[in-house]
Amino acid sequence: MKLKISSLSSGYPSQGSLLPGLIPLENGTEDAIINTPGNNTFTLTCQGSGGGNSKSVVVEGYRNTDGVVVDGYISSAEVFVDEDEDWMADSNESSTTSDNNGKFTIKYADGYLVSLGGTDLDSQTLLDNLLITHKLTGHTDFKAVTPVTSVAAFMATPANINTALGIDASIDVYTFDPVANKGDGGINDYLYEKGNQLTVLAFTLQNITNNLNTTTETTQDYFKAFTEEIEKEYTETSTNVDIETEAFVT
């Protein structure tokens, strides 16, 4: 990130002596590089034979990240970075809305990248209270928010996500778009299938609970519960967990 500081007429003679450490700026602009996220203070000092003056400006340094919300593509989802783990978009947290292809751009911060609600692009089904997430632990240019990253977000050892669900080790689930890459008849389709299965289970249980209790719970707790069962079984067997079995569902 660069801050352009335009030279201003100071009223001081240009031939005046400069204090040690000051750089003369006569015409044009000077680039100030922002390397640190958060507030950065820049000071412009004018110094000449008649005296001097300084002005400071505080500039927030931040990076954006692009991403996509995918079960199928989910449009019009509320996308936000949950920094305090209350699973709501607070006024001080970055938020945006996914476009018709599930894509978004958002200001990066560590926390949980959350997608809430929206519409399934293919079926035009409303996904009220569907919450999927991606735990943010470092900036990258692109993030995928999927049912699989939702399970990984709640795992004690997220590095086990591929082996626990039988996903090929070559796939980075945090940046891989399952919809754009499906149709290979192999490892990509398997990932897409696992995501769909997780969503169907979580969304169905959420809707049953909300209808019975007249509540508006999200799928967050169901993804947490699935994660606990997946990790428990994977720890006991050291083999990938089949989430299609009756034993897992019950």
Locations of regions flagged by a protein language model:
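Feature for extracytoplasmic/surface-facing segments of secreted or surface-associated proteins
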Residues: Y62-T250
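C-terminal edge beta-strand
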Residues: N53-G61
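Short edge beta-strand/loop segments characteristic of extracellular beta-sandwich folds
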Residues: M1-S6, D66-V70
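Exposed beta-strand face motif in extracellular beta-rich ectodomains
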Residues: G38-F42, G111-Y112
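Short beta-strand segments within Ig-like beta-sandwich modules, predominantly Fibronectin type-III
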Residues: P20-E26, S95-S98
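Short strand-edge motifs at loop-to-beta-strand transitions and within beta-strands
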Residues: G28-A32, F104
